[in-house]
Design a protein with these regions (language model features):
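Short secondary-structure boundary micro-motifs
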Residues: 1, 7-9, 15-16, 77-79, ...
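Alpha-helical assembly-interface signal, strongest on the long, hydrophobic N-terminal helix that forms
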Residues: 1-68
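Short amphipathic secondary-structure patches
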Residues: 42-105
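Generic short beta-strand segments
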Residues: 106-112
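Low-complexity, S/T/G/P-rich flexible repeat/linker segments used as non-globular hinges
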Residues: 112-137
Length: 137
């Protein structure tokens, strides 16, 4: 009976550890996604005015890939994100694929509690966010 009790306790501890690690990864991913959302909005605000097609036309917001990436990195630096997240990187695909949408892709390493010795480099997570600027009167 003692062996059975010890076995159940070990299984319960194992389940609790796995749930705790999975919850930690999930929460860190949500934090990274929130950071990516803020960076994409900041990047979408870095537009320049496009050329007018005709005299009565309305100006358009034009984004460049380099400017989007620069604005995203600046946003992350101002918010201390590089200190909060381990191995935080801005992916090379960050930019503006169509000149109107800012796409920010962030990647970081998560170190879950208790099971950190099993994955010493951490678990890589990635968050993608898009934002658009629209001019209106």
């Amino acid at each position: 009976m003692l062996v059975l009790s010890i076995g159940f306790i070990l299984i319960a501890l194992l389940v609790a550890t796995v749930v705790m690690a999975a919850s930690s990864v999930y929460l860190e991913h949500k934090k990274l996604l929130s950071l990516a959302d803020g960076a994409s909005v900041a990047a979408a605000d870095s537009f320049t005015l496009g050329q007018l097609g005709n005299a009565g036309g309305t100006p358009t917001a034009v984004l460049s890939g380099a400017r989007v990436r620069s604005a995203a990195v600046d946003y992350l630096g101002r918010n201390g994100a590089f200190e909060r997240f381990s191995a935080l990187t801005v992916a090379p695909v960050t930019g503006s694929p169509d000149g109107a949408t800012a796409v920010v892709v962030l990647s970081a390493a998560v170190h879950p509690p208790v099971v950190n010795f099993l994955v010493p480099d951490g678990i890589r997570i990635e968050a993608t966010s898009t934002a658009r600027s629209r001019l209106s009167r």
